[in-house]
Amino acid sequence: MSVSIRRWVVRHPVAAFLVMVYVVNIAVALPSNLTRRDLLPFGFAPYDLLGHIVGSAVPAFLVVAAVLGRGGVRDLVRRTLRWRVKVRWYLLALFFVPVASVLAATALVGTAPLEALGDKWPLLFTVVLPYLLLALFSNLAKEIGWTGFLFDRLQNRYAPLKASLIVWVPWALFHLPGFYEETGSAPGALLLLGLFAIPQLCSRVLVAWLYNNTNRSVFLVGLFHAAFNTTTGPFTREFIPATAEDQFLIQIGGIIIAAILIAVITRGRLSYGPVADQREQPGTITRRVRS
């Protein structure tokens, strides 16, 4: 990294992170699109996984290294690997979304989801669990950048709820290439962007609350993200027998309600407060707020 670029990164760490994320994300989305059209081998998964790692985690570590040096990098690594948290947070991260989905589906379509769970429960181990493990690897890489670096830095300056709102905008745009892959058209991608805008905002609020309650554990946030994607993917396909419209409402309903309740109960603070290893970051104003 040249001296001039390093100086710019130090002065504008958030902008530097986002520039790198978007450049890499677009670059990786291209081969992913080509493999879907059988123009590149191996299928799209290797390129998608590479994009999650190189596109979010690597920029975060590069910026942290430039701004905070080795101490900052060690701190981010510790938070990424922080797994010693209370059992209740593991239960919440893993089971909140699937349980809420089953309850919402039961309210909408009757006992069919419960019957599907009783009849096809082996799929929880043969289909759902393998997907969850792969999703944990890829989503942990994303959360290193978006929560471990970006949100963590912004909540020190703006407080957590406002920081969640700020992160939400680039986070939503980050998904545009994926929406384009799914729909194959720009209008379709923009439509999905609009449909998922509010659920994505609410998910960022829940992520912030979970992060602050687990001593800034990026690992637990990645686990929650993986459980969410697993629920909206194979779990819903196998155990939520409903129309596509009902499935969408089921998936987002619990997230929206939970985010609103948490924001109201914590008065927007999302359990933010001082932690033992929190570091002052250059160019930020650190606030101490009681949970």
Regions found by a protein language model. Give the residues of each.
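Interfacial transmembrane-helix boundary/kink motif in multi-pass membrane proteins
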Residues: 2-19, 43-52, 71-103, 115-128, ...
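Alpha-helical transmembrane segments in multi-pass membrane proteins
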Residues: 16-22, 27-65, 88-95, 116-131, ...
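Residue-level signature of the transmembrane alpha-helical core
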Residues: 22, 54, 94-95, 128, ...
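Aromatic-anchored segments of alpha-helical transmembrane domains
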Residues: 22-30, 98-106, 169-178, 226-235
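Membrane-interface helix termini and inter-helical loops of multi-pass transporters
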Residues: 37-43, 108-119, 180-188, 237-244
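Membrane-interface helix/loop boundary segments of multi-pass membrane proteins
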Residues: 141-168, 208-217
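Membrane-helix boundary elements
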Residues: 165-189
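C-terminal membrane module of polytopic membrane proteins
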Residues: 214-291
